[in-house]
Amino acid sequence: MIRVDDVRIKSLKPLISPAELKEMFPVTEEISGHVASSRSKIEDIISGRDNRLLALVGPCSIHDIEAGLDYARRLKKLSDEISDRIFVVMRIYFEKPRTRLGWRGLILDPYLDGSYDIEEGLKRARSFLSDVAKMKLPAGSEMLDPIIPQYIADLTCWAAIG
């Protein structure tokens, strides 16, 4: 019989499990407290119990980790200065769902070269979110499927469903 299924698959590589990745970049009690507190503040703002403005601020998507961390440090400083009026959440998107040609995002193509090392992309994304959480800056991201949130949702304070 002539093979007709999966004829264009070059190779298979199982992904790291969410539990394994979380072991590599664990959430401390301090970080989980920050995430829970930030989620509660966002809920209060959306429901009208907190009169501050909620602002999700950041680049289209993260591609340069160092530039992203520099941005986060600057945003944290500004956030602290305006926290009585505006609750700032850093927009940290790792995927580009509406991009069909070109770079698809840090998780899918962390090296920006078409290599699609998704495991490395997941590691970079979780590490980045962990670093931002350590700054006590709330993070917001877009969730496009039921898989990726298993790796990063515990470090995310706000989510868009894409």
Feature locations, PLM:
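N- or domain-start disorder-to-order transition segments that initiate the globular core
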Residues: 8-47
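Glycine-rich anion/phosphate-binding loops
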Residues: 62-82, 115-127
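Hydrophobic, well-ordered secondary-structure segments
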Residues: 45-46, 67-70, 76, 106-111
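Short glycine-rich or small-residue beta-strand-to-loop segments that form or flank ligand, phosphate
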Residues: 52-64, 89-93
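Solvent-exposed alpha-helices and their adjacent loops that cap or buttress functional pockets
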Residues: 47-49, 132-133
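N-terminal beta-rich core of secreted/periplasmic extracellular enzymes
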Residues: 31-42, 76-89, 95, 125, ...
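Short, basic, glycine/proline-bearing loop/turn elements
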Residues: 28-29, 60, 112-115
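Active-site-facing alpha/beta catalytic cores
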Residues: 1-5, 85-162
